[in-house]
Amino acid sequence: MFALADVNSFYASCEKVFRPDLRDRSVVVLSNNDGCVIPRSAEAKKLGIKMGVPWFQLRSAKFPEPVIAFSSNYALYASMSNRVMVHLEELAPRVEQYSIDEMFLDIRGIDSCIDFEDFGRQLREHVRSGTGLTIGVGMGPTKTLAKSAQWASKEWSQFGGVLALTLHNQKRTEKLLSLQPVEEIWGVGRRISKKLNTMGITTALQLARANPTFIRKNFNVVLERTVRELNGESCISLEEAPPPKQQIVCSRSFGERVTTYEAMRQAVCQHAERAAEKLRGERQFCRHIAVFVKTSPFAVTEPYYGNLASEKLLIPTQDTRDIIAAAVRALDRIWVDGHRYAKAGCMLNDFTPTGVSQLNLFDEVQPRERSEQLMQVLDGINHPGKGKIWFAGRGIAPEWQMKRELLSPAYTTRWADIPAAKLT
């Protein structure tokens, strides 16, 4: 049996935890550069606020009650996600972090001591009392059925946020699947659901009763696996340790359009520096560094320009200095004056677990001395936050930095921002 714990309205809920005055208020969190609404609290959803609505439109709209908006506070959300993970691990033997707000749990054998749904309610209370966040819990003999159960626990309030689908109660499973639209099934996207609809498959139950061989022939092995999972055959195991990444991408839209080479070089240096940090976090080395730049495709009065260039190193590296140097060389090959650039990024590929490679007799490139020790010191100083020490190439206070004018304090990662309680 698997359980899926999903934090309700995660980003908005994190903002509410440290602001008791917002407990029953409408809260939304904005995307990068305070562009549009992404997460919404339950109260905001009741007001009819849609995901993706631009903030400038929402700001001038009239509602029966005020809507409080926050810029995305990624450090806070990552910290709170880790707290939820720790609390789940205190009650479950094996936990897989599927996303920042979703965790799969291995709950095999739990029912020999306690009813599955009673255990789900224990999980909810343990996380709520320890973090202030509310989770929904869905349980099933497969990951896909656990995901469907979790969907139903949100869809119908009578379940109290907890629902278990077991092999001993097939009628309940079939009833739920008959009510679940096919596009709500885990792993079934919009494109696949449209094709399924043309075949007369509109619900999860109809997909579960489809012939797996037919599904594999007309779609792919992934959807066939989904069909088997809907029928209680576990095909997707728990992954306590995530597989090694095959690519690292660091990119961001600019808060202000970039028009000068110097500003773009600073941005590329910052993205390369962050990508190198992530690479070392994966304990990997890379040989391929790419940089891309592009203008806004929506600026109808300006010509569009986008390009990408890459550099391949003779020796795999995880040294920020090497990665920045390669990224700047790539930028030099694609930079064109006269454009108003909206976005840039750095990509790392071709990973290896060691920095060893076979050099030719006349190769002049040699590994940097004490590179690993220097990077360890650098990462140690910057841990657990970012920006304590950085390379000068990224500048000091660039104007193009991402806009976060409504950013909440770093309640859990900065001493100065720890909330103070006063007794009166």
From Swiss-Prot:
A cellular-component GO term for this protein: cytosol
The protein's name: Protein SamB
Gene3D superfamilies (alphabetical): 3.30.70.270, 3.40.1170.60, 5' to 3' exonuclease, C-terminal subdomain, DNA polymerase, Y-family, little finger domain
Pfam family, one: IMS_C
Organism: Salmonella typhimurium
Family, per entry: Belongs to the DNA polymerase type-Y family.
Family annotation (InterPro entries): DNA/RNA_pol_sf, DNA_pol_Y-fam_lit_finger_sf, DNA_pol_Y-fam_little_finger, DNA_polymerase-Y, DUF4113, Rev_trsase/Diguanyl_cyclase, UmuC
Every UmuC domain range: 2-189
Record keywords, A-Z: DNA damage, DNA repair, Plasmid, SOS mutagenesis, SOS response
Function: Involved in UV protection and mutation.
CDD domains to which the protein is assigned, alphabetical: PolY_Pol_V_umuC
One GO MF term: DNA-directed DNA polymerase activity
